[in-house]
Amino acid sequence: YGMTETTAGATIGYPGNNKIGTVGKAFVGDIRIDNPNEAGDGEIQFRGRHIMKGYYNNPEATAETMTEDGWLKSGDLGREDSEGYISVTGRIKEIYVSSAGKNIAPLVIEETMKSIPLVSQCMLIGDNRKYCSALFTLDVGAILRDKHGMDGAKVPKDPAEQLAKLKEFGHELSEYTDSPEIHAELQEHVDRLNGQFSNPEQLKKFTILPRDLSVDHGELTPTLKIRRIQIRENWASEIEAMY
């Protein structure tokens, strides 16, 4: 893990010095987690001979990126464990602040919730809110596999083909998005996964959307990253119903 300003890599994992879910340890210079929250998440910062001296002919940008004592601000959120392994958990610009003033990093929570087998997409809601909630979409491929016994290797990759295959089984996606049983199944997973987070970060409610997020609706970038502003606009009534 690293950036151009750190002369490429600044951390590395290698055989005998590796931990799944981390980007390894510093292999040159120093790394610190600046101003960590209760969960240990703070800005990842670097210092050492491998760090740039500044941006060419741009002292303003340099001053914004470098601290007075020579630490480079990465703009990334992360944490360091007791063995020195670094985990990247989000971006500073994506930090939510609850109505109680708690800083919440949505990315790590969203990725954790996406580990639920039936969940395709998850977007956390919590900025200036009393508690966290989420929008879920269902993974049609997982429905075909887990609810209809379809061989995972034969599940179509194309979302439209997945929906067509679901219809061949005599079902519509709405039967699952509106299903109390599916909601209860997801709730069991959410309750279990919530244990990984502090109380302000835990999901108190969630809503299953009637369709997956899409590029066509402006909700995903071409590289399939979620576009938070557009999603909040498209599903405003569903979000407000959770509060």
Where are these regions (language model features)?
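Residue-level signal for inorganic ion chemistry
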Residues: 31, 84, 113, 134
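Conserved C-terminal "lid"/linker of ANL adenylate-forming enzymes
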Residues: 121-123, 130, 189-243
